[in-house]
Curated annotation (Swiss-Prot):
GO biological process, one term: DNA recombination
NCBIfam families the record matches: tigrfam_recA (TIGR02012)
Protein name: Protein RecA
Kinase listed as a keyword: no
Binding site for ATP: 81-88
SMART domains: AAA
Biological role stated in the UniProt entry: Can catalyze the hydrolysis of ATP in the presence of single-stranded DNA, the ATP-dependent uptake of single-stranded DNA by duplex DNA, and the ATP-dependent hybridization of homologous single-stranded DNAs. It interacts with LexA causing its activation and leading to its autocatalytic cleavage.
Gene3D superfamilies linked: P-loop containing nucleotide triphosphate hydrolases
Length: 365
């Protein structure tokens, strides 16, 4: 008797669900008539339900820390930190990666300070990079909106939020008080941009600067410019800090680069609060080889014994800088390591099945 009752209850639930689905379908038809096709769809039929596409950062260790293999498409990203900490370098490296994949990038240079020589050294095809140097903050953000709506741009970089000066402030006198103008400008622009970003699959990066809050006795006195809107709308927030200077071997005065620390303070697409250290060489950008070496050691593809580094039974060299230099010369080996690491990290590849190309030992030691 209980089985019959249970069967009747299941049939009743099925009928109820069917009637609910019919009601939702009727509502969907009405919604699409009013707002257009695709206004309401099941998540399994939407690109949102099929995972988030990404743009490589140019560093495998940062790609791993970001959780999805790079910067998420269709999202807002904020990169902030003190001066000369590597913020612009990170964005230019991302532009170079987009262009390598055949994508299109734009740089909105509100600071009017983009160095094409440095960008080219980082691998950016400056001849194909779209550049805008707007006069006002409104102009910059409207240009960004038009580019996003075009659907043809893969990556937009805005440098920087602090330089997005409202027109009213530019037209006013130097001593005029213009409290909250920039914050209101950013809030309005981000409300408009957010909805169209996901549909166009465009990634937009905002470079931001740090300011000190007056009168803060306890806690962190640092804050970013442009109000709180960007903090809320950003899916990814990266804090960049300079850790130490890198000097040429055998010299304490010949500085050739910086080591920076990137902390992911907010991440809506993967676990946040991860930290990575990157090496930036002056005139060259982020060291791809240093990132590959760190990742290979972490995932046991390269073994470190004392100051010696080895790949299987073959020694790569003694000392970190020596091995990085060796990997920069052995391009085929470096590319192969990168390929294998990405399989290990992002595809749960069985490390025991990883086989490396033939290569010669580092004979410089």
């Amino acid at each position: 008797m209980s089985k019959l009752k249970e069967k009747r209850e299941k049939v009743a639930v099925s009928i109820e669900r069917s009637s609910k689905e019919e009601a939702v379908e009727l509502a969907r038809v009405q919604i699409e008539k009013t707002f257009g096709k695709g206004s309401l769809i099941k998540m399994g039929e939407s690109p949102v339900g099929k995972g988030i596409k990404s743009i490589s950062s140019g560093s495998i260790v940062l790609d791993e820390a970001l959780g999805i293999g790079g910067y998420p498409r269709g999202r807002i990203i904020e990169i902030f930190g003190p001066e000369s900490s590597g913020k612009t370098t990170l964005t230019l490296q991302a532009i170079a990666e987009v262009q390598k994949e055949g994508g299109i990038a734009a740089f909105i240079d509100a600071e009017h300070a983009l160095d094409p020589v440095y960008a080219k050294a980082l691998g950016v095809n400056v001849a194909e990079l779209w550049l805008s140097q707007p006069d006002t903050g409104e102009q910059a953000l409207e240009i960004a909106e038009h580019l996003i709506r075009s659907g043809g741009i893969d990556l937009i970089v805005v440098d920087s939020v602090a330089a997005l000066t409202p027109k009213l402030e530019i037209d006013g006198e130097m001593g005029d008080s213009q409290i909250g103008l920039q914050a209101r400008l950013m809030s309005k622009a981000l409300r408009k941009i957010t909805g169209i970003l996901s549909k166009s699959n465009t990634c937009i990066m905002f470079i931001n600067q740090i300011r000190m809050r007056i009168g803060i006795m306890f806690g962190n006195p640092e804050t970013t410019t442009g109000g709180n809107a960007l903090k809320f709308y950003a899916s990814l927030r990266l804090e960049v800090r300079k850790v130490e200077q890198i000097t040429r071997s055998g010299s304490s005065d010949d500085v050739i680069g910086n080591k920076i620390r990137v902390k992911i303070v907010k991440n809506k697409v993967a676990p946040p609060f991860r930290k990575v250290e990157l090496v930036i060489y002056f005139g060259k950008g982020i060291s791809r080889e240093a990132g590959i070496l760190d990742a290979a050691i972490k995932h046991n593809l390269i073994q470190k014994t004392g100051s010696w580094y080895s790949l299987g039974d073959n020694k790569l060299g003694q000392g970190r800088e020596s091995v990085i230099e060796y990997l920069s010369k052995e391009v085929e080996l470096t590319n192969d390591l990168d390929k294998r690491l990405r399989k290990v990290i992002f595809n749960n590849f069985d490390q025991e099945d990883v086989s490396f190309i033939e290569y010669k030992e580092n004979e410089s030691e």
